[in-house]
């Protein structure tokens, strides 16, 4: 399987990514195939506007119920907000994946 070369984010997360305040993304199984060491082009989901490149550092499975304050800090939000956002995007999904990255 070929690793994905593109990643999208809601535009509301762009500033935090560019500022280095958001260093992970939590995705469902359909987006678990990113490979550590690869670089992806990042664009806004709404407009498809490219705004940076990210190097994938790790991809780790996690249960929704195991999310904690450390994950929230890496997402630059409170744990309560993080869980609300994830439920909004992936309603009812328990198995998720934490993708850690750095801007290049």
Swiss-Prot record:
Any one of the GO CC terms: cytosol
Record keywords, A-Z: Hydrolase
EC number(s) given by UniProt: 3.5.1.135
Keyword set includes Disulfide bond: no
Annotated SMART domains: ASCH (SM01022)
GO molecular function: hydrolase activity, acting on carbon-nitrogen (but not peptide) bonds, in linear amidines; N4-acetylcytidine amidohydrolase activity
Matching HAMAP family: ac4C_amidohydr (MF_00684)
Function comment: Catalyzes the hydrolysis of N(4)-acetylcytidine (ac4C).
Protein name from the UniProt record: N(4)-acetylcytidine amidohydrolase
């Amino acid at each position: 399987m070929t690793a994905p070369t593109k990643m999208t984010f809601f535009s509301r997360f762009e500033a935090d990514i560019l500022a280095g305040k958001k260093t992970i993304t939590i995705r469902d199984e359909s987006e678990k195939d990113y490979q550590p060491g690869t670089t992806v082009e990042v664009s806004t989901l709404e407009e498809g506007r490219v705004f940076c490149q990210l190097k994938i550092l790790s991809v780790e499975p996690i249960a929704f119920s195991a999310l904690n304050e450390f994950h929230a800090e890496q997402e630059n939000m409170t744990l309560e907000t993080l869980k609300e956002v994830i439920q909004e995007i992936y309603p009812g999904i328990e198995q998720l994946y934490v993708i850690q990255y750095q801007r290049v």
